[in-house]
């Protein structure tokens, strides 16, 4: 049994049993992977994968247990490397983060700047995606940390730590009627709304607030990016609902932000990492 064989069966599962995609991601050949899997199955005396002709179609019952153990072994191997790096050069290495646009654009820049000043020999790598995508990256150990408000709780193998609470603001053009009256859910629901796609930046709590009052918001446009939302508010498509931290009066001229924290429950941004991961000192 070879470590490489364990990596192959683990990666095949991450690529939905697609051997070609697995080979491409590992910069190796499809026949080479198939041969190593057959050798491992022959050594173990069982099939890890069920097949239809040459295609892998499912994981066998025993294969599921084997792959779970393989994932732990691969994680332990990575931890061994981290321990060695920490012992030889504790301030040198790499750090990979997966997060959403809102966090990358509005929250992390000052944090990243301070980190890079404190650890100039650590290279940083940032991946952006949906909350589900970045949670999967952390669960699969493809990044060190995932930072998001949604989806992390769906993965049992992730440790989650709350980082900060935030709420929302209503974004309107200068002179909008909502600026002249108390802000209510009824008033917001009466307007065309531009906001986040479901599953992004606390959108689920937004929908729950309206549903709790028996209201159906008139959402006319959705996006994953607060900058895009503000652009379409400027175009007159509707009023925007975004994270308050994504509004900057100096940069967002021509727009006004109305605090809506009394209407919606706080959202909590969390940092998640794979359970059992050895964390470097930095």
Describe the residue ranges of each PLM region.
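A short LG(V/I)-centered, amphipathic sequence patch enriched
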Residues: 41-61
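Central regulatory/effector-binding core of bacterial HTH transcription factors
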Residues: 92-154, 216, 222-223
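A late-sequence structural motif
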Residues: 107, 256-282
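Alpha-helical linker/hinge and terminal dimerization helices associated
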Residues: 43-44, 66-88
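Flexible hinge/capping segments at coil-to-helix
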Residues: 155-193
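Secondary-structure junction motif
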Residues: 178, 192-213, 279-282
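Hydrophobic hinge/microswitch elements
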Residues: 130-143, 149, 201-258
């Amino acid at each position: 049994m070879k470590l490489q064989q364990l990596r192959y069966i683990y990666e095949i599962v991450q690529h939905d049993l697609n051997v070609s995609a697995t080979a491409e991601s590992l910069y190796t050949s499809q026949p080479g992977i198939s041969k190593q899997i057959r050798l491992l199955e022959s050594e173990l005396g069982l099939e890890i994968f069920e097949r239809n002709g040459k295609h892998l179609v499912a994981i066998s019952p025993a294969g599921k247990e084997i792959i779970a153990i393989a994932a732990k072994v691969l994680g332990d191997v990575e931890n061994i490397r981290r321990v060695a790096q920490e012992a030889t050069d504790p301030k040198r290495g790499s750090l990979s983060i997966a997060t959403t646009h809102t966090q990358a654009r509005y929250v992390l820049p000052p944090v990243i700047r301070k980190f890079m000043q404190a650890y100039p020999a650590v290279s940083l790598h940032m991946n952006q995606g949906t909350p589900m995508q970045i949670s999967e990256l952390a669960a699969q150990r493809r990044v060190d940390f995932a930072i998001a408000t949604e989806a992390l709780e769906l993965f049992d193998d992730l440790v989650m730590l709350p980082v900060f609470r935030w709420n929302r603001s209503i974004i309107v053009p200068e002179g909008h009627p909502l600026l002249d009256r108390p802000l209510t859910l009824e008033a917001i629901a009466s307007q065309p709304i531009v906001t986040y796609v479901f599953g992004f930046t606390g959108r689920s709590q937004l929908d729950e607030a309206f549903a709790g009052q028996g209201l159906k918001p008139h959402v006319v446009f959705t996006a994953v990016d607060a900058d895009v939302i503000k652009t379409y508010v400027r175009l007159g498509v509707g009023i925007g609902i975004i994270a308050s931290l994504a509004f900057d009066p100096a940069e967002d001229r021509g727009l006004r932000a109305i605090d809506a924290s009394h209407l919606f429950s706080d959202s909590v941004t969390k940092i998640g990492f794979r359970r059992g991961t050895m964390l470097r000192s930095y």
